[in-house]
Amino acid sequence: MKKSLKELTGLIVAFALATLLFLYWPLYQRSVPKANNDAPVDVVLIGGGIMSVTLGTYLQELQPDWKIELFERLNGIAQESSDGWNNAGTGHSAFAELNYTPELQDGTIEIKRAIKIAEQFEISREFWSHQVRHGRLPAPTEFINATPHMSFVWGEDRIEYLRKRHNALIKNPLFYGMQFSTDPAIIQKWAPLLMEGRTQDQKVAATYMPLGTDVNFGVITRDLAKHLQDSQNFALHLDHEVTALRQNPDKTWNVTVKDLNNGQERSIKSRFVFIGAGGAALKLLQLSGIPESKDYAGFPVGGQFLSFENTAITKRHNVKAYGMAESGSPPMSVPHLDARKLDGKSIVLFGPFALYSTKFLKNGSWFDLYSSVNHHNAAGMLSVGKNNIDLVKYLMKQATLTDADRHAELLKYFPNAKPTDWTLVTAGQRVQIIKRDPDKGMILQFGTEIVMDKDHTLATLLGASPGASTSPSIMLDLLAKAFPQQMKNGWETQLKKIIPSYGQHINDSPALTNKIRRMTSETLSLPYLEVPDKSATPADPTIAPKNQHSTTYNANSEMQAL
């Protein structure tokens, strides 16, 4: 008996020590090489995706004498979520995504989020237009193409919801031109594949926005990065992985990087560090050791799509058609049948289907999730899991899907589809934010968030959606937070040349909407609609009363996306 108790005690002690090691080891700071540059560079960008490259493009124009270095662990730019095949949310402008316009308890439609995202996408168009005019981006048709956006629903309740959504949105200049119909013949004209083979007794409705676009962020990222390298003050380091971040007493940072070709490590001193590493940003934020990092954790979710490349199909579907999540399913499950242009070809993608993975990057490690767990966030992550049982069940169910199950979902949006028409492709990884709320403790937060240290010397972008589509707007926010002095001393004036609407809300005025859209449509070879003043005065966005959302332990649930 005594021997058994001794063995049990030993096991308990061993388990406790192993648990402590597991929770504290990720934050252990090992010794690293000293910086090999006495004079710090101005900026280090971590990650070769759309965010880092967009920020670098801004900085190179605003402060061309600054020395900028970018480190990417893979052997090329834009190989993770910025790549066209890995980026599910292309051309996000809130024209079709129904989760951005939730119906409130009183039956009204909240459109505040949709208007904000639509304005952010207009800023993206301004930014890309500026780069095209200055030769930093190729012919617009190589990265952005007119692709109408549709919302498509069936069932009386959903049809009524879509009607109310349409009525609320078209009062705003940014949504002028959106059409609504319950006529199957009209909807079939918009999107033949949605309607052919559908039973005649099924009531359907759709909205159609002719100003929608499809965007290839891989092309944008690679071409902007190519232009950045034209400057002697910019250096790109591929096959280099950041392994440590240490702040010096003078508030500069030593960034330790490993050359993956030879295994050698070195450190570089920098005045400012931006972590734009997609899903890996959380782990790098934790490596920095800044107090703000203790308030965050992450939850990875992968995505898969059915890909159609047969021209007999792709030439008959030139829209992005978004549906509505099934009853009881999380908003991230919103299905869409997307017309895309990838690798110079027309493609149609249907999905997403969630993919369980513990990786934070498509080319990451299966240990990514576990190595991000520490004594600061472990209990909170368990609490978030308990408060999101429906989401956990959904992901578990998705993990068991067969090809027959996926095809059954496809038939709801493409009734005449055949299993031989498609192949299953895996997209990029998304890491949803788990953060500490002062009132609720750890919560699951959707959308993106900039995390910055109190000295404004290190910034990280966490989260996923809408992500790339609003990258110029997100990086504008970062510039304002990280470099307030420079903004006051000349940057704001220069930014108005890059973003003519800077400091204004495009949706506030039909005249401003027309001015900006006319300019970007001409530069980007996109369709344009003149907004008449009398019919498109901006509506006061409906804002949900705070108590309507008080029962949830999540934040920004309408921003869920794969």
Curated annotation (Swiss-Prot):
Keywords: FAD, Flavoprotein, Oxidoreductase, Tricarboxylic acid cycle. Its cofactor is FAD. One of its GO terms (molecular function) is 2-hydroxyglutarate dehydrogenase activity. The keyword Oxidoreductase applies. One of its GO terms (biological process) is tricarboxylic acid cycle. It comes from the Bacteria. Belongs to the MQO family. This is Probable malate:quinone oxidoreductase. The gene is mqo.
